[in-house]
């Protein structure tokens, strides 16, 4: 069952290939003592497994996958269906396309029952992908325990692994890694940390832990383990493909979790933002400046505290007296759309607080309605995004106060769930506590507790905006987007929404820039194509004297490098909280002309280059929409089969794989992530092409052979970029 009827989508049945082995069952139900396991063929080359102890599920449990999938065999399982039941005393075999499930006992028929998953190779042989981890003298690989008196339980599910396995995806963490092998990842959202239990393995399978609960992912040497802190059902999916065929794995994942719609054209241009434009006059002067300087801009953003009170979900009329006039003037001067920030928090002095409280539309604490956080001296509670009525209330305010006045794009900041996810200032006290993550497990929602459904909150918040968009434009889910949202968090299948995810409030230093590259590649492997960053980083690092200061040459260099890199991201966006020696507005500047006379032409040249890449961008976004094919592409996606060095480089998380990537099928991007650089080393993979020198350096047109590290000129005005094939084809978008 879906969490909301909004997710209902008829299956788009894809004609199976002649060699496709249709499922030999609609499902197998195993009764194993107090435990029940339901295994169903799911989509192409996949199985869905659900397990529970004692009490059966209701069938209405929260799920992030389509049932039936967007693509799959026509007569496969759905809901809780099955055609075979067993007590677990007999071995069973199910097949779905190129994946096989076998059930086997160990240590005798009373010791347990293990599931094993195999891929059918092109030559007909079978390869073990993984099985339930059950060495001698160990806990059951499906381990349940009850930490409290209620019906919800905790679960730990363990699967076998090998030392040479490589793990890609898992959402985003600030860790310099694209291979997550060896990681322990807590599934708790906070600023710049979006753990999401979707991964691909170099062994030729992908895995989705289809659960809204907080928990943990562990990728050990011999064991992969997933835990759920509080649940009534364990639900996961495994899909198979041939080794190295990551496009097929992404197609399978997106067929289960959702395909991205096509973005509106304006979102692919340059997005201007800072903390913060304080009032209508500043925004109109900004638009006039872009117009007078003849610099293209596609969206201008109004950041937080533009409201009178938290939860008003309206611009403060004292600062923004005529919103419709402002948005029209911005449009007339620049052609740009507008976006405004909103937070999910509601202060008790908000005009909306009484109505939200009276109708049960706010999150609450376990022991009563109490407050869940504070901000700048006000007690606050988040609206309950898991409640459909709360989502409708939020959109009604946004439509009346923004959308109908010309601001039709929304920045859903602080959407991590639980609370704001940060304790900046505790009820107005003088002590400043910076970005301390906490889960607030005492928070309750309509859908459950923070422990049991906490990972749902940001996803449902994205859904609130999507539902509003679709109702306002009378369009169906999956159709092209007219507008966009921008979220600091997400979860399984967030790509189905017209919603960007950005990497959060990062610090303005070189190492943080480097970390963002790896973070974006993990986002891509998770299935999120709509990803971006704050160019220049968001906040000052207090240990680095020049960090974020637009008047220092040290920060200007970092900003130019960072901004150049965003040209080759799914979305090109600048934002940040800057410092300066000379301040002529409410906050320090962050516009293209703010970084010195010598740097302005460089910044503007990259903005123009972004628009020159428009046809290419539309082409790669269209493929992501149609098939789930990744936009940002870690090198293993394209070159693992043709270049034997790639696997070794990825295994060690070498900079040549964490700091460079393919942007679509033709561009190799290697951003400079160190200061004072005049040349930069780049690893050019072997492509398998007959062309002995397939790589062309963008700035010099010099060609290079693959399979080697080359050092190329990289002055401040040039980000290292190579292309395959002709530049003319690339710029025309004729690349597939």
Curated annotation (Swiss-Prot):
- As recorded in UniProt, its EC number(s) are 3.2.1.177
Q: What is this protein called?
A: Alpha-xylosidase A
Instruction: Give the protein's biological function.
Output: Catalyzes the liberation of alpha-xylose from the non-reducing terminal glucose of xyloglucan oligosaccharides.
**Which gene is the coding source of this polypeptide chain?**
axlA
Catalysis: reaction(s): Hydrolysis of terminal, non-reducing alpha-D-xylose residues with release of alpha-D-xylose
Concerning its family, UniProt says: Belongs to the glycosyl hydrolase 31 family.
Residues at the active site: 413, 505
Taxonomic classification, please? Eukaryota, Fungi, Dikarya, Ascomycota, Pezizomycotina
Cell location = Secreted
Functional pH dependence: Optimum pH is 3.0-4.0.
**UniProt xrefs under InterPro entries:** Gal_mutarotase_sf_dom (IPR011013), Glyco_hydro_31_C (IPR048395), Glyco_hydro_31_TIM (IPR000322), Glyco_hydro_b (IPR013780), Glycoside_hydrolase_SF (IPR017853), Glycosyl_Hydrolase_31 (IPR051816)
GO cellular component terms, A-Z = extracellular region; membrane
Cite the GO molecular-function annotations of the record: alpha-D-xyloside xylohydrolase; carbohydrate binding
User: Signal sequence: where?
Assistant: 1-18
| A Pfam entry, by short name | Glyco_hydro_31_2nd
Q: Which UniProt keywords apply?
A: Glycoprotein, Glycosidase, Hydrolase, Secreted, Signal
- Temperature and activity: Optimum temperature is 55 degrees Celsius.
Give the GO terms filed under biological process for this record. Answer: carbohydrate metabolic process
Q: Which domain of life is it from?
A: Eukaryota
| Carbohydrate-modified residues | 24, 279, 332, 376, 471, 655, 676, 690, 701
């Amino acid at each position: 069952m879906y969490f909301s009827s909004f997710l209902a989508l008829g299956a788009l049945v894809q004609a199976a290939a002649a060699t496709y082995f249709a499922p030999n069952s609609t499902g197998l139900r195993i009764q194993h003592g107090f435990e029940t396991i339901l295994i169903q063929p799911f989509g192409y080359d996949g199985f869905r497994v659900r397990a529970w102890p004692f009490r059966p599920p209701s069938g209405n449990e929260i799920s992030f996958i389509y049932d039936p999938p967007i693509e799959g065999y026509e007569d496969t399982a759905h809901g809780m269906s099955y055609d075979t039941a067993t007590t677990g005393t007999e071995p069973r075999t199910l097949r779905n396309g190129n994946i096989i499930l076998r059930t086997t006992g160990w240590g005798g028929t009373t010791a347990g029952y293990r599931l094993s998953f195999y891929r059918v190779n092109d030559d007909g042989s079978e390869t073990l992908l993984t099985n339930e981890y059950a060495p001698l003298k160990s806990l059951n690989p499906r381990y349940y325990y009850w930490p409290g008196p209620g019906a919800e339980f905790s679960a730990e599910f363990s699967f076998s692994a090998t030392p040479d396995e490589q793990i890609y995806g898992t959402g985003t963490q600030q860790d310099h890694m694209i291979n997550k092998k060896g990681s322990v990842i807590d599934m708790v959202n906070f600023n710049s940390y979006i753990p999401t239990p979707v991964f691909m393995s170099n062994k030729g399978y992908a895995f989705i832990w289809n659960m809204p609960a907080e928990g943990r992912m562990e990728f050990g040497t011999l064991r992969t383990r997933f835990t759920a802190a509080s649940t009534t059902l364990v639900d996961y999916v495994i899909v198979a493909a041939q080794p190295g065929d990551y496009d097929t794995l992404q197609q399978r994942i997106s067929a289960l979790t959702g395909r991205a719609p096509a973005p509106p054209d304006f979102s692919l241009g340059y997005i201007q933002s800072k903390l913060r434009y304080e009032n209508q006059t500043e925004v109109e002067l900004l638009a006039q400046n872009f117009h007078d300087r003849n610099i293209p801009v596609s969206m201008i953003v109004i950041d937080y505290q533009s409201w009178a009170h938290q939860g008003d979900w309206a611009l403060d009329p004292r600062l923004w007296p005529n919103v419709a006039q402002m948005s029209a003037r911005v449009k007339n001067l620049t052609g740009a759309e507008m976006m405004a920030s909103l937070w999910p928090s509601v202060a008790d002095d908000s005009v909306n607080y009484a109505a939200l409280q009276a109708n049960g539309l706010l999150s609450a604490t376990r022991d009563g309605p109490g407050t869940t956080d504070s901000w700048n001296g006000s007690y606050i509670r988040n609206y309950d995004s898991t409640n459909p009525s709360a989502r409708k209330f939020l959109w009604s305010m946004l439509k009346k106060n923004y959308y109908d006045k010309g601001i039709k794009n929304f920045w859903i900041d602080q959407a991590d769930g639980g609370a704001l996810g940060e304790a900046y200032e505790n009820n107005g006290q003088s002590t400043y506590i910076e970005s301390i993550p906490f889960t607030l497990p005492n928070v309750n929602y309509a859908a459950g507790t923070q422990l049991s459904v906490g990972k749902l909150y940001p996803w449902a918040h994205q859904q609130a905006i999507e539902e509003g968009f679709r109702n306002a434009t009378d369009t169906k889910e999956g159709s092209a987007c007219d507008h966009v949202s921008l979220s600091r968090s997400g979860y399984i299948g967030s790509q189905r929404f017209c919603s960007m995810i950005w990497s959060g409030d990062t610090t303005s230093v070189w190492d943080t820039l480097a970390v963002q590259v790896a973070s974006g590649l993990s986002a891509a492997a998770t299935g999120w194509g709509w990803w971006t960053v704050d160019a220049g980083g968001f906040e000052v690092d207090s240990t680095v004297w020049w960090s974020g200061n637009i008047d220092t040459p040290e920060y200007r260099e970092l900003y130019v490098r960072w901004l150049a890199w965003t040209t080759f991201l799914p979305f090109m966006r600048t934002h940040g909280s800057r410092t300066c020696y000379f301040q002529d507005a409410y906050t320090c500047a962050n516009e293209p002309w703010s970084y010195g006379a010598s740097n302005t032409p460089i910044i503007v040249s990259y903005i123009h280059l972004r628009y020159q890449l428009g046809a290419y961008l539309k082409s790669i976004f269209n493929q992501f929409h149609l098939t789930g094919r990744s936009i940002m592409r870690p090198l293993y996606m394209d070159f693992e089969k043709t270049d034997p060095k790639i696997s070794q480089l990825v295994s060690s998380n070498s900079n040549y794989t964490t700091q460079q990537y393919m942007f679509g099928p033709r561009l190799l991007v290697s951003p400079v992530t160190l200061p004072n650089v005049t040349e930069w080393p780049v690893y050019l993979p072997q492509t398998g092409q007959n062309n002995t020198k397939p790589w062309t350096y963008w700035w010099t047109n010099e060609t290079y052979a693959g399979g080697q590290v080359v050092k190329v000129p990289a002055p401040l005005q040039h980000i290292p970029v190579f292309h395959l094939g002709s530049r003319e084809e690339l710029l025309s978008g004729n690349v597939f």
